From Swiss-Prot:
Residues 67-328 form the Protein kinase domain. Pfam families: Pkinase, Pkinase_C. The lineage of its organism: Eukaryota, Metazoa, Chordata, Craniata, Vertebrata. It is found in: Cytoplasm; Nucleus. Residues 436-469 have a biased composition (Pro residues). The active site is at D194 (proton acceptor). This is Ribosomal protein S6 kinase beta-2. One of its GO terms (cellular component) is nucleus.
Length: 485
């Protein structure tokens, strides 16, 4: 079976308790009591019916029933994103974002399967102040669920739309936090490859968080290259477009395009269609507005060097070379990493449940996670083995006991981004999710996170119970934003 069902068994000499007397169930409990309890003995063994209640003996079983839907935050072809509240177990009352994906739509598309697997694996393995945190991952017969920290500040795209352009000090702050996040990914051999305002969220305090890791490439260390054609055209480096092979330097080109976008109102190379946009990226002239300071002009030029070996950040120094540029001379990097620097913008939020920074077209909808009775074949389900995950911080809190901490611009289009990503197609559809390196993973779909148990039977066609609807009357909430990916 997949690694998710691997159990570490005692194999050392003497682990069987040499010299200790053998015993039977009758030595522990009289036979009559065993039969009264519904257990029958066969020789020295007992037969016990395996049910959900008999194998789920841990302090918490994670599943859709643990969350109450509050609002719809976004919607796409892959599924929905909800704001939810945890109503059972550890972190009772905490607000999360819940991404729900339909398995049937994912398995029929190579790129969506690759996207989902990459995002799930990277969210588990990478922890950083400026990268979104994954709390839980679980699945039912027809759906996948990712429970993420709720970033109520909305997308940087929305904020940039409202402001038009940023002052250099504002742009410097966001670019510096993004630089630290990219540097951390690169140190783990991960290329991000889809940096754009839509994939950068703001926390309630105004700090950035990178999201959407489906186009990432893993295991790309110094000297390694990859050839996959993917990303969002306006932010794609020329070496991706000409398919000569690329490495982590593509992220610094994208950061340069984002910097240009922040300071001028649009990416550096745009046209009426993708073909002409690509031509401009490959051979067009970079035009910088005269109002940029010399440091900003110099950094933008160095980010947007077409030769990746000449691009700032493209050498061995990676993010360290970017951090040393005079544009960031006023940044205290230690304070920035510790989030001791006040953000230039702090979202105006009335409560943890405030969704005013998201698109009102979605937040006005009644949140419903409809039952899905789709039954996938055994071979199709192979793509989702090992999906379940519980964050180590959650496991720690389970061990310690329950905690309660309810804690004027025309080029852009706010309704939906005109920039759609191109996903990679090179992958093995049955390459499973990486098993957690830490505590044992809960059994599929929602078995206990702490106690190892026998593997559960494969999913049946029985539809899972829908997540409970919000109590009371749905309040109308105002706000703007754009949908999911």
């Amino acid at each position: 079976m997949a690694a998710v069902f691997d159990l570490d068994l005692e194999t050392e000499e003497g682990s069987e308790g040499e010299g200790e007397p053998e015993f039977s169930p009758a030595d522990v409990c009289p036979l009559g009591e065993l039969r009264a309890a519904g257990l029958e003995t066969v020789g020295h063994y007992e037969e016990v019916e395996l049910t959900e209640s008999s194998v789920n003996l841990g302090p918490e079983r994670i599943g859709p029933h643990c969350f109450e839907l509050l609002s719809v935050l976004g919607k796409g072809g892959y599924g929905k994103v909800f704001q939810v509240r945890k109503v059972q177990g550890t972190n009772l009352g905490k607000i999360y974002a819940m991404k729900v994906l339909r398995k049937a739509k994912i398995v029929c598309s190579a790129k969506d399967t690759a996207h989902t697997r990459a995002e799930r694996n990277i969210l588990e393995s990478v922890k950083h102040p400026f990268i979104v945190e994954l709390a839980y991952a679980f699945q039912t017969g027809g759906k996948l669920y990712l429970i993420l920290e709720c970033l109520s500040g909305g997308e940087l795209f929305t904020h940039l739309e409202r402001e038009g352009i940023f002052l250099e000090d504002t742009a410097c702050f966001y670019l510096a936090e993004i630089t630290l996040a990219l540097g951390h990914l690169h140190s783990h051999g991960i290329i991000y490859r889809d940096l754009k305002p839509e994939n950068i969220m703001l926390s309630s305090q105004g700090h950035i968080k990178l999201t959407d890791f489906g186009l990432c490439k893993e295991s790309i260390h110094e000297g390694a290259i990859t050839h996959t054609f993917c990303g969002t055209i306006e932010y794609m480096a020329p070496e991706i477009l000409v398919r000569t092979g690329h490495n982590r330097a593509v992220d610094w080109w994208s950061l340069g395009a984002l910097m240009y976008d922040m300071l001028t109102g649009s990416p550096p190379f745009t046209a009426e269609n993708r073909k002409k946009t690509m031509d401009k990226i490959i051979k067009g002239k970079l035009v910088l507005p005269p109002y940029l300071t010399p440091d900003a002009r110099d950094l933008a030029k160095k980010f947007l060097k077409r030769n990746p070996t000449q691009r700032i950040g493209g050498g061995l120094g990676d993010a360290a070379d970017v951090q040393r540029h005079p544009f960031f001379r006023h940044i205290n990097w230690d304070d920035l990493l510790a989030r001791r620097v006040d953000p230039p913008f702090r979202p105006s939020l009335q409560s943890e449940e405030d969704v005013s920074q998201f698109d009102a077209r979605f937040t006005r909808q009644t949140p419903v996670d409809s039952p899905d009775d789709t039954a996938l074949s055994e071979s199709a389900n192979q793509a989702f083995l090992g999906f379940t995950y519980v964050a180590p911080s959650v496991l720690d809190s389970i061990k310690e006991g329950f905690s309660f901490q309810p804690k004027l611009r025309s080029p852009r289009r706010l309704n939906s981004s005109p920039r759609t990503p191109i996903s990679p197609l090179k992958f093995s559809p049955f390459e499973g999710f990486r098993p957690s390196p830490g505590p044992p993973e809960p059994m599929e779909p929602s078995l206990p996170p702490l106690l190892p148990s026998p593997p559960s039977p494969p999913p049946t066609s029985t539809a899972p119970l829908p997540i409970r609807p919000p109590s009371g009357t749905k309040k109308s909430k105002k706000g703007r934003g754009r949908s999911g990916r």
